[in-house]
Amino acid sequence: MYQNFGQFIDGKWTPSSDGGVYEVVNPSNEEILGNASKATNRDVEQALHSAKKGLEIWKKTPAWERSAKIRKIADLIRDKKDIVANWIALEVGKPFAQGQGEAIASADIFEWNAEETKRIYGQIVESRFADTRIQIKYEPVGVVAALTPWNFPTILAARKISTALAAGCSVICKPDMVTPGSVMQLVDIVREAGIPAGVVNLLSGDPASISSQLLSSDIVKKISITGSTRVGKIILKQAAEKVQRVTMELS
């Protein structure tokens, strides 16, 4: 099932640099779904440099153009909702109808952020000096590392990716090892929508090693994580070393 995917780096699906894979199991019947690609340190480095390059392109893309591409992602998710739902059903063990609901909700999030892209307003502030005004302009924070859980793999990846895209940021998404295909399918839709190479990247594999390498890099400027409180504490402590911005949703 995973042969068409792998690591998504610089706009392309590629196997891991050493060809490593791991088994993904269907929780409803404990059958092996297939072998998903397992990222190496080299893959992580390539993804980091890809995201850095993608940021330079995306942050200069006009808001209305970004909005149109994000809206196209929403439309494609709706067109492919049954494919997305099938991945969710197989990997998470949810009923197919719930998978469809998650797919539709994911599309709604992309549509919402497509419009929010146009509403990133600055401010004009009065100055203490005559004939002078202060302009406040918001700029993309930079490369975002998005760490997603297994229980709602598509909708939470959609929330993180679409928000980063709306703000003009590039993103490296790390799905849970249990549900890589659900997020891979979403990222492939992003590719199909014409998002420039390097703007969205995906790393599949061991969460601890990948997350640690991402956070230790000077390229990553923000981390978004949905996960356990235990993992959140680890992430927050590591991010503090570089004063990286962190957004957490913890259980």
Question: Where do the language-model regions lie?
Answer:
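Glycine-rich loop-to-alpha-helix module at the N-terminal edge of alpha/beta enzyme cores
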Residues: 31-121, 131
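An amphipathic alpha-helix/helix-turn recognition signal
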Residues: 25, 42, 46, 61, ...
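Rossmann-like NAD(P) dinucleotide-binding subdomain of oxidoreductase/dehydrogenase enzymes
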Residues: 122-251
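Histidine- and aromatic-rich ligand-binding microenvironments
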Residues: 7-9, 23-26, 35-46, 194-199, ...
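Terminal low-complexity tails and localization/encapsulation signals of metabolic enzymes
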Residues: 1-35, 68, 72, 122-147, ...
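Hydrophobic residues in alpha-helical segments
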Residues: 8, 55-59, 77, 165, ...
